[in-house]
Structure formats: structure tokens, C-alpha cells
């Protein structure tokens, strides 16, 4: 997660907080939403992103890889921050479309950030990428296509 956050120029602590809120930092979590979409993995990448991600060779099964999922999640967050500015609305947009839901989500992330110890006291996460080539696909600049 740390490398993904740094690569996409977003806060490492913020990415950790979002992963905690989304999945409890568990890579194998899959959640079926009431609208029929699915949230996948560590950063709970919504299945609506699959069309965009497929253009870069990233499939649904690739999102089960912790490292790939972290890079995609950090990229989504960076796009929100670029589009909406460095504010809590952009953080909330990671999870929700409407302003009220965005703010409720952002408050959860904020509370999690306040409970998270400084990164220097956190143990390093294990590197578990099974397919390092997938990360190379994410290292190319991705363009925002208004997805989500």
C-alpha cells in the first residue's frame, strides 16, 4: 500500500485509513452491493471500474491481488483529489456519489486516521504480489475517464 500511495502522490496514512474502513485491511473481502455491483479486495474496488481497468489489462481476478488492488485504489483516490481538490469531499467520493454519503464516509475515514498510529510505528506490510507484471501496467499514467 505504501508504494502505491507514494506512486500516485497520495498520503500513505490516508490510503491505510481507507483500506481499514473499506475492508479492515483484508485482501480477500468481496462485498455484493444492493445495486448489483461488487466491491473487491483490500481497497474494495467497485466492479463498475472493470471496464476502465480492462483497457489496461486488469481483470476482476487481478483485483484479488493485494498489491494490484492497492495501486488501483490509490489511483482512484488520486483521481478524486485531482478532480475535486484536496478536501474531504474527494475522500468521500472514493466510496459514495452523493454529497451526504460522501461526508458520512469521509467522517469514518477521518476517525480512522485519528486512531492510526504514525507510520513509523506500524509494521511493514508483507509484499504478496503474485503477478508483478500487473503492477507494471498500473505504472503507466492512467487517464481519468469520468468513471464513477
Short names for language-model regions:
Residues 123-148:
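Intrinsically disordered, low-complexity charged/polar segments
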Amino acid at each position: 500500500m505504501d508504494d502505491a500511495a507514494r506512486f500516485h502522490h497520495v498520503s500513505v496514512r490516508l490510503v491505510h485509513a481507507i483500506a481499514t474502513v473499506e475492508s479492515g485491511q483484508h485482501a480477500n473481502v468481496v462485498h455484493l452491493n444492493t445495486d448489483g455491483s461488487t466491491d473487491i479486495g483490500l481497497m474494495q474496488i467497485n466492479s463498475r471500474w472493470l471496464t476502465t481497468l480492462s483497457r489496461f489489462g486488469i481483470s476482476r481476478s487481478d483485483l484479488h491481488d493485494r498489491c494490484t488492488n492497492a495501486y488501483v485504489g490509490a489511483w482512484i483516490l488520486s483521481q478524486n483529489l485531482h478532480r475535486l481538490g484536496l478536501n474531504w469531499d474527494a475522500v468521500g467520493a472514493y466510496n459514495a456519489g452523493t454529497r451526504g454519503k460522501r461526508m458520512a464516509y469521509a467522517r469514518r475515514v477521518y476517525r480512522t486516521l485519528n486512531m492510526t498510529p504514525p507510520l513509523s510505528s506500524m509494521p511493514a506490510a508483507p509484499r504478496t504480489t503474485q503477478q508483478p507484471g500487473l503492477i507494471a501496467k498500473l505504472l503507466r499514467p492512467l487517464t481519468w475517464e469520468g468513471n464513477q
